[in-house]
C-alpha cells in the first residue's frame, strides 16, 4: 500500500534500529583479518566436508591459502570468541591449510582479466604485498611488471621463513598464479642498481614500492663488531638459499624474542649447532613470538633466557667468546618510553656466534626521492599509501606492514589507489577505508546458551630430536576427522537472535537492519509484515539492545487502517465485537471459520 502515511515516530524508531542493529555485523574473525576473509563461512563448509566450496571462499580473498595455512600470524584466531572467552581459538590456519591441500588445483583458478587498458604498472618486489598488488591490477586489465632482485618468488617470506615451516614447492605452486594471470616478473633485477628508480617513473604510469625489509639491524653493544656477530636477515637468507652458514660456530646465542628469533634458533640446530641459546628483554610470558614457535623451540632444546638483556659481547682476538646478560627489571619508563633498567644479577654464556633478531629495515631504492622514517619505512599517506612522489605508492614492509596477511592487504590498498588514479578519481573521496584493512567488529552478543570450553586440536608434529637436524616439514597438519571436529568448535558468531526467535520476520528480510532500512527508504511496508506480528515480544527479549520491533509493527496498523478507509487492508479480517483492546479489534485480528471435521 503505497498511499499509507506512517507516523514519524515509526520512522524514528526504525532509524534507531538501523543505526545500531548488529544483524549485518561481520564476526570478529573476519574483521580482524586485513583481507576480510569469510572465516566463519569456510570453516563451516570445511566441517561439512565441502572442501571445494570452502576453498572457493578462501581464494576469493587469498591467493596463498597453503602458505597462510602454515605461517600466517592469524589475527583472526586472536580475535576468535573461543580465544577471548576460553583462550583456545579455532585453528583457522590449520583448517585453511587442510582445505587447500585437499582441493586447490591450478586448473580451477580464476584467470579472468579485464580488457587491456593500455596502462602499465611497475611493482618492485615479489613478496606478498607486491604479488597482491599485481593480481588486483592485472585483473583490471593493466599491464603489470614485477621487478624482483632475487631469482625466485616470495620475497622476505621466501628467504626469511625457514623451509621446515614453509616448503618451497608450496610457494612455487601458489605463486604460479601470477604467471597464469599474465603478470610479467623480471627476476634478478635490483632497482636503484640495475635500473634507476627514475627510469621506472618515466616508463610506467604508476609504481608500487613493495620491496621487503632486507637490511638487518645489529644493536651496537660493546663487542658487536667481533667476528661471529650477524644479523638475522643475513643468517636466514643464506640458510634459506644454501641450508648452511659456514661462518657460524657451534654455540649460538640469538638475541630477540619474536618469531624471527625463533626461526634463527631452530635453524641453527639444522645446520649443525651443538648449543642454542636465546635472550630477550621480554619475559617468557611476554615474548612477542607466537606460542607455537616458542613451544616448538623449547621442544627442540633451545635454552631460553627471556627477561635477561644482553649488555656486552665478549671476544678474544676479535672473535666472539661469550655474551653477558643482566636481569631485566623494566623495559619502559613511566611515560612508556623505551628505557630498559637492569638488576645487578648477571649471566655469562659462552658462545661463538651471536645473531641479532632485533629488527630490520627497508633499503631506500629511490635515491632519496621518497622520504623514509628513522625506522627505515617510506613516508606515505596511511590510508591511500600514496607517497610524496606523484604516481608512486608503497606497500608491505616498506609501508609498515608487519605480517604476511597485512602485506597482502596493503598491496591491495595500493592497487585500489592506482585504480582511482587511472580513473581520474580523488584517492579519498567516497572511499570506505575500513573495508580495506582490519577493524573492530561491531558484534557484541552473549555466548550461545550451553557454550562450554572445548580443547583446541593440533596437527601432528615430527619428533623433536629427529626434526631438528633436517629441513623437512615439521607439522603434518590436520586429518579430515580433525578438521570436522575443530570446525564444530566454531560458535558461528552472528547476532540475528531475533530472527531465530520470530516465526515471521525471516519471510521479509535478512535482519531488522535491512528490513527497516527498506521501510525508511521506500516509505512503504508490506501490510503482511505488520499484521503477521503476534506481539509476543520475543524479538525484543533476545535482542542484546532491547530494540522494540513489535512497536513498529503494531504501531503501523492504525496507519494502514486510516489509509484504507477505516478497514483492515488484510482480506479475511472479520469483526470480533467483544471487549478486546484496540490491538485485537476487528481492524487488527484475523479470524477463520472452524474446520469441520
Language-model segments: which ranges?
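Mid-to-C-terminal Rossmann-like scaffold of FAD/NAD(P)H-dependent oxidoreductases
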Residues: 9-11, 20, 295-301, 309-319, ...
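Iron-sulfur-cluster electron-transfer modules
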Residues: 27-31, 40-221, 509-597
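N-terminal glycine-rich dinucleotide-binding loop that anchors FAD/FMN and/or NAD(P) in oxidoreductases
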Residues: 90, 161-185, 224-232, 289-315, ...
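Glycine-rich dinucleotide-binding loop and its adjacent helix/turn
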Residues: 99-115, 173-193, 216-271, 373-388
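Short beta-strand "acidic-cap" motif of Rossmann-like dinucleotide-binding folds
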Residues: 142-148, 273-280
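FAD-site-proximal beta/loop scaffold in flavoenzymes
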Residues: 225-250, 333-402, 409, 416
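Internal hydrophobic alpha-helix adjacent to the cofactor/substrate pocket in enzyme cavities
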Residues: 264-279, 405-430
Amino acid at each position: 500500500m503505497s498511499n499509507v502515511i506512517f507516523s514519524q515516530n515509526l520512522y524514528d524508531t526504525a532509524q534507531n534500529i538501523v543505526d545500531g542493529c548488529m544483524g549485518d555485523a561481520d564476526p570478529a574473525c573476519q574483521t580482524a583479518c586485513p583481507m576480510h576473509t569469510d572465516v566463519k563461512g569456510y570453516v563451516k563448509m570445511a566441517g561439512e566436508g565441502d572442501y571445494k566450496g570452502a576453498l572457493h571462499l578462501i581464494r576469493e580473498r587469498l591467493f596463498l591459502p597453503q602458505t597462510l595455512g602454515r605461517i600466517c600470524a592469524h589475527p583472526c584466531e586472536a580475535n576468535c570468541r573461543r580465544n577471548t572467552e576460553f583462550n583456545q581459538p579455532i585453528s583457522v590456519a590449520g583448517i585453511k591449510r587442510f582445505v587447500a591441500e585437499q582441493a586447490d588445483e591450478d586448473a580451477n583458478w580464476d584467470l579472468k582479466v579485464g580488457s587491456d587498458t593500455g596502462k602499465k604498472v611497475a611493482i618492485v618486489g615479489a613478496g606478498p604485498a607486491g604479488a597482491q598488488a599485481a593480481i588486483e591490477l592485472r585483473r583490471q586489465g593493466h599491464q603489470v611488471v614485477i621487478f624482483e632482485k632475487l631469482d625466485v618468488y616470495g620475497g622476505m617470506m621466501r628467504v626469511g621463513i625457514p623451509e621446515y615451516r614453509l616448503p618451497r614447492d608450496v610457494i612455487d605452486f601458489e605463486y604460479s598464479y601470477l604467471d597464469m594471470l599474465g603478470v610479467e616478473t623480471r627476476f634478478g633485477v635490483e632497482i636503484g642498481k640495475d635500473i634507476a628508480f627514475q627510469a621506472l617513473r618515466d616508463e610506467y604510469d604508476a609504481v608500487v614500492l613493495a620491496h621487503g625489509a632486507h637490511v638487518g639491524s645489529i644493536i651496537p653493544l660493546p663487542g658487536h663488531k667481533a667476528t661471529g656477530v650477524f644479523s638475522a636477515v643475513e643468517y636466514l637468507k643464506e640458510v634459506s638459499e644454501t641450508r648452511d652458514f659456514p661462518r657460524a660456530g657451534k654455540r649460538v646465542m640469538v638475541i630477540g624474542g619474536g618469531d624471527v628469533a625463533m626461526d634463527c634458533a631452530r635453524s641453527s640446530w639444522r645446520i649443525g649447532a651443538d648449543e642454542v641459546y636465546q635472550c630477550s628483554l621480554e619475559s617468557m610470558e611476554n615474548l612477542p613470538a607466537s606460542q607455537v614457535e616458542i613451544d616448538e623451540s623449547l621442544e627442540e632444546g633451545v635454552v631460553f633466557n627471556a627477561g635477561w638483556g644482553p649488555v656486552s659481547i665478549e671476544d678474544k682476538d676479535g672473535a666472539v667468546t661469550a655474551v653477558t646478560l643482566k636481569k631485566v627489571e623494566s623495559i619502559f619508563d613511566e611515560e612508556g618510553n623505551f628505557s630498559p633498567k637492569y638488576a645487578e644479577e648477571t649471566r655469562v654464556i659462552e658462545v661463538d656466534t651471536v645473531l641479532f633478531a632485533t629488527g630490520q629495515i627497508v633499503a631506500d631504492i629511490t635515491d632519496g626521492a621518497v622520504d623514509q622514517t628513522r625506522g627505515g619505512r617510506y613516508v606515505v599517506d596511511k590510508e591511500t599509501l600514496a607517497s610524496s612522489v606523484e604516481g608512486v605508492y608503497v606497500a608491505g614492509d616498506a609501508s609498515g606492514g608487519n605480517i604476511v596477511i597485512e602485506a597482502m592487504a596493503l598491496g591491495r590498498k595500493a592497487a585500489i589507489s592506482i585504480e582511482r588514479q587511472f580513473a581520474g578519481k580523488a584517492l579519498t573521496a567516497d572511499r570506505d577505508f575500513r573495508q580495506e584493512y582490519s577493524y573492530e567488529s561491531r558484534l557484541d552478543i552473549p555466548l550461545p546458551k550451553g557454550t562450554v570450553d572445548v580443547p583446541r586440536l593440533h596437527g601432528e608434529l615430527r619428533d623433536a630430536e629427529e626434526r631438528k637436524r633436517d629441513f623437512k616439514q615439521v607439522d603434518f597438519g590436520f586429518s579430515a576427522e580433525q578438521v570436522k571436529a575443530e570446525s564444530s568448535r566454531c560458535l558461528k558468531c552472528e547476532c540475528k537472535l531475533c530472527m531465530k526467535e520470530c516465526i515471521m520476520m525471516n519471510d521479509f528480510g535478512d535482519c531488522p537492519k535491512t528490513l527497516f532500512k527498506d521501510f525508511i527508504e521506500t516509505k512503504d511496508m508490506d501490510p503482511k509484515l505488520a499484521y503477521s506480528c503476534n506481539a509476543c515480544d520475543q524479538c525484543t527479549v533476545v535482542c542484546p539492545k532491547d530494540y522494540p520491533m513489535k512497536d513498529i509493527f503494531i504501531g503501523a496498523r492504525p496507519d494502514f487502517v486510516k489509509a484504507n478507509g477505516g478497514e483492515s487492508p488484510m482480506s479475511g479480517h472479520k469483526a470480533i465485537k467483544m471487549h478486546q483492546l484496540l490491538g485485537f479489534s476487528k481492524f487488527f485480528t484475523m479470524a477463520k471459520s472452524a474446520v469441520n471435521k
